[in-house]
């Protein structure tokens, strides 16, 4: 009996072809999307290969190729366009975003250009201070050299997977603007002018039977990849967040993104519930991001 790895893992699966086929066996190489009731493997071309689990004769787990720094920078460009805040500006390779202090991703400076350097942090701090906002830096892996330990740090994982179109669950409602039900379930104060901005992209606000909500944004990366990013996940309870409600909601939003040309999906996670849901849907680690207060000790000597 085959012992299946987690969904999203790169695999080679050898399976039997229909009786009389020559050769009698063939291989599917790609990302494992499902194992029951049908095995589904997505190849690097995007083709999905399907076959019965009883026809599987061998399985090999493949190592993921190392993520290039350029790929991290490209994804972060797309993610920044998905949460640009209500005010933004470029400063020496940094994108500075402000939005009433709500949602850290839209109230932080991120070093997107290769020219970004820590010697700009004093000016970044002044920009946020002039708006009565805490100056936060969002620093993805390898985009900027940092001191090893800085005070007030918060870490996020950025997880990714391939996406494809599909029929959404009829229990999922998708809107291009958050309604009262969506805002009520979100629980926190999220001004509309914070929730709805996107740079050269499209938004969807999804809800599942009034027990779970999430936001999706389709934006483009400089390398040409079109991404759909999931965020603002809230649910009535943890079971709704990690169970069928969360899965159906996310799948519907990913399918919506694929229908608008997205080929890859991402989500930023910093809590267990979101991580469990993401991994159950085949998301895998791409890189980390660190949020740091700009006044952290060590910037002036680094």
Swiss-Prot record:
The keyword Magnesium does not apply. Exhibits stability over a wide range of pH (5.0-9.0). Induction: Up-regulated in acidic and nutritive stress conditions. Detected exclusively in intraphagosomally grown mycobacteria. It comes from the Bacteria. Keywords: Acyltransferase, Transferase. The keyword Thylakoid does not apply. It catalyses: L-lysyl-[histone] + acetyl-CoA = N(6)-acetyl-L-lysyl-[histone] + CoA + H(+). It is an enzyme of class 2 (transferase). Its EC number is 2.3.1.48. It holds the Pfam family Rv0428c_C. Stable up to 40 degrees Celsius. GO terms for molecular function: acyltransferase activity. InterPro entries: Rv0428c-like_C, SH3_Rv0428c. Expression in M.smegmatis leads to enhanced growth rate and altered colony morphology, and promotes the survival of bacteria under acidic and nutritive stress conditions. Shows histone acetyl transferase (HAT) activity with recombinant eukaryotic H3 histone expressed in bacteria as substrate and acetyl-CoA as donor. May be involved in survival under stress conditions. This is Probable histone acetyltransferase Rv0428c. It comes from Mycobacterium tuberculosis (strain ATCC 25618 / H37Rv).
